[in-house]
Amino acid sequence: CYKDENGTYDSLVWLKKAVENTRYHDVEIHITEWNSSPNCRDLVHDTAFMAPFIVQNYIKTIGLADSIGFWTFTDIFEEESLGQSVFHGGFGMLNIQGLKKPSYHGFWFLSRLGNELLERTDSYVITRKENRIQVLMWNYCHYNDVYANGDPTCISQLDRYSAFAEKGDELIQIHFDKPEEKFRMIQYTFDRAHGSVFDSWLENGAPEPPDEEELQILRTKSELESHISYLDGADDICIRLKPHGVTLLEFTPIK
C-alpha cells in the first residue's frame, strides 16, 4: 500500500519531470494498472476507504498523466483463483456477485464532474458544465502507521477499519451570494452507512455466501443516498462528511 497518502501524486510529479528532461518530453503518459496496493487479497480494497482514495488521487493528479487506468473492473481476476470470501480484498469495482464496491462509487462521482475546473483543494473540487455547478467533497482517512508499514496483522476479515488512522467528521460550509437567484440542488452521499456494500454485508451478519434474498438486500444497500432541495441564492449550506465519506452537490439554476 502507499505509505504516504501523497504517494501517487509524488510518483507522477517525479515521472513527469523525468520524461520532460528527455528527448521524448512530449510523449503521453498513461498509467495502466493503478490501485491502492498491488495485492489482490488486500482486505482494504472492499472498504469505504476506496471511494475517497480514488476521488482524492484523481483530482490531485489532474494534468500529471494523460490517463490513469484502474486495476481492475471486477474481482473475477484471471491471474488468481476466486477468493474464498464474498469480500476477499479483490482489485475490482464489482465483487464476484456483481455488487458495486466503494471503488465503483468513486469513479461514479468523478463521472459527474463538469469539464470546466473552477476550484480545487485537498478536500473538495468545484466544476461547471454548461449552466450547472458541481461541488465534490470528501473526507479521506489514510492508513495508520502499522498498516502503512506493511503489517496487515492489525486487521481481520471482519475488522478492517483498524487499518486507518482515527479521524472525525469534517464540516464544509457553502455560502451563496446571489440572493436574486434560485437553485435546485441534488445531493449524493457515500459513507460507511450509505452505499458501502461491505459495511452492509457486515451489518447483515456477513453471510458466506449470501442467498438471493440477501443479495437483493445488498444490491439495494450498495446505492448512494440522494435527495433534492430547492434553495434561494442567499442560503447557507452545511455538509457533514463522515470519515471515508464523499458527497456530491449538483446545482442547477431555476429560471
Where do the language-model regions lie?
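Flexible, surface-exposed loop/gating regions in the mature catalytic domains
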Residues: 70, 78-82
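Acidic/polar loop patches that form or flank catalytic/metal-binding clefts of enzymes
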Residues: 65-72, 102-104, 115-122, 184
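Noncatalytic carbohydrate-binding groove/subsite architecture in carbohydrate-active enzymes
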Residues: 1-68, 85-87
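Hard-cation-handling environments
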Residues: 31, 123-144
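C-terminal beta-sandwich/jelly-roll accessory domains of carbohydrate-active enzymes
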Residues: 137-255
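A structural motif corresponding to the C-terminal end of an alpha-helix
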Residues: 14-26, 60-67, 110-116, 175-179, ...
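Solvent-exposed loop/turn segments at secondary-structure junctions
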Residues: 35-38, 74-77, 141-142
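Catalytic cores of secreted or luminal carbohydrate-active enzymes
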Residues: 58, 84-120, 144
